[in-house]
Amino acid sequence: MANSANTNTVPKLYRSVIEDVINDVRDIFLDDGVDEQVLMELKTLWENKLMQSRAVDGFHSEEQQLLLQVQQQHQPQQQQHHHHHHQHQQAQPQQTVPQQAQTQQVLIPASQQATAPQVIVPDSKLLQHMNASSITSAAATAATLALPAGVTPVQQLLTNSGQLLQVVRAANGAQYILQPQQSVVLQQQVIPQMQPGGVQAPVIQQVLAPLPGGISPQTGVIIQPQQILFTGNKTQVIPTTVAAPAPAQAPMPAAGQQQPQAQPAQQQAPLVLQVDGTGDTSSEEDEDEEEDYDDDEEEDKEKDGAEDGQVEEEPLNSEDDVSDEEGQELFDTENVVVCQYDKIHRSKNKWKFHLKDGIMNLNGRDYIFSKAIGDAEW
């Protein structure tokens, strides 16, 4: 392809385009309250993007060229300094070898194995403040705690997680095993109160226990303070529950029974007979008007349908239109030329183009031309 393109003018063209755009939008930006520094940053970003694309050679300002020259001069000096520093690092290990031979060995005695901590509970009230994570909730695992002698043989305790535990004396008589019982929803405080006669009645405040099996789920349960009686070696727990009856539902009327009417039926107005002539013809006129209105609606629908049919018809020369998909396929190529044309000649499958005032991107480089002539076959 013969053309009069000049690569030296490409950077000037791009720079003139950037300056024209920045100058044209400066007044608009100032009217909108945008600082002029934003325009300078936009211009710098535009130039950097153009240089990174490497589509234009020589697109550097005088200041940028000076910076590139200074950087090129500093690179040999940095390489020499790095080489000298690398030789100095290689000489250091030879000097430090004798010092490493004089190092002394220090023996560190092995630490004793840490013994497992023992949990000592001085009072039964402190069991309420224990962390629930330290007690295993599995049914097959029992937590063994060493309790003082002041704790009663059988006692129920509540943890922070709402779990009910029971203290049972083991066979050896030296340990107490906490067995998990049924969990409760809410627990507050267990205040043991001693009553005369050796009876200990812990008062459970705001404790919601699971429902007993004999009470239906629809019936409310009110939990009362439990009493634990000690008679020799036997223990008896007497729970006192009061079942709150469910609210009675209103009886539904039978299916065959009709409800009495709340209001008496309104009396119909008496009929007045017309004896002075024939009946009125207003109803016939109304029917005629309705028929005319229906006819008008049908005519309007037919007209609308005809118009819709015309719109659905394919317009003339529709095959000549270029769809969007074809437009995208045309630009899916590496080499692109945007220009105007003077003449195009065709002979069978050979084409000859006379182009002018264009810019093209070939093999990643941009070129501009005023006139160009090209041949093609397809």
UniProtKB/Swiss-Prot annotation:
UniProt keyword annotations, A-Z: Acetylation, Nucleus, Phosphoprotein, Transcription, Transcription regulation
Distribution of this protein across tissues and organs: Expressed in pachytene spermatocytes and spermatids.
Biased composition (Acidic residues): 282-331
Induction of the gene: Up-regulated during germ cell differentiation in testis.
Principal place of residence: nucleus
Record region (Disordered): 69-108, 247-331
Top-level lineage group: Eukaryota
Binding site for DNA: H345, R346
Gene Ontology cellular component annotations, sorted alphabetically: cytoplasm; cytosol; nucleus; transcription factor TFIIA complex; transcription factor TFIID complex; transcription preinitiation complex
Marked site: Cleavage: D276, G277
Compositional bias annotation for Low complexity: 69-79, 89-106, 247-281
Post-translational modification: The alpha and beta subunits are postranslationally produced from the precursor form by TASP1. The cleavage promotes proteasomal degradation.
UniProt modified residues of type N-acetylalanine: A2
Protein location: Nucleus
GO MF terms held by the record: protein heterodimerization activity; RNA polymerase II core promoter sequence-specific DNA binding; RNA polymerase II general transcription initiation factor activity; RNA polymerase II general transcription initiation factor binding; RNA polymerase II-specific DNA-binding transcription factor binding; TBP-class protein binding
GO biological process, one term: RNA polymerase II preinitiation complex assembly
CDD domains membership: TFIIA_alpha_beta_like
Residue stretches in coiled coil: none
Phosphoserine: residues carrying this PTM: S282, S283, S318, S323
Subunit organization: TFIIA is a heterodimer of the large unprocessed subunit 1 and a small subunit gamma. It was originally believed to be a heterotrimer of an alpha (p35), a beta (p19) and a gamma subunit (p12). TFIIA forms a complex with TBP.
Annotated function: TFIIA is a component of the transcription machinery of RNA polymerase II and plays an important role in transcriptional activation. TFIIA in a complex with TBP mediates transcriptional activity.
Family designation: Belongs to the TFIIA subunit 1 family.
UniProt-listed PANTHER family: TRANSCRIPTION INITIATION FACTOR IIA SUBUNIT 1
Protein's recorded name: Transcription initiation factor IIA subunit 1
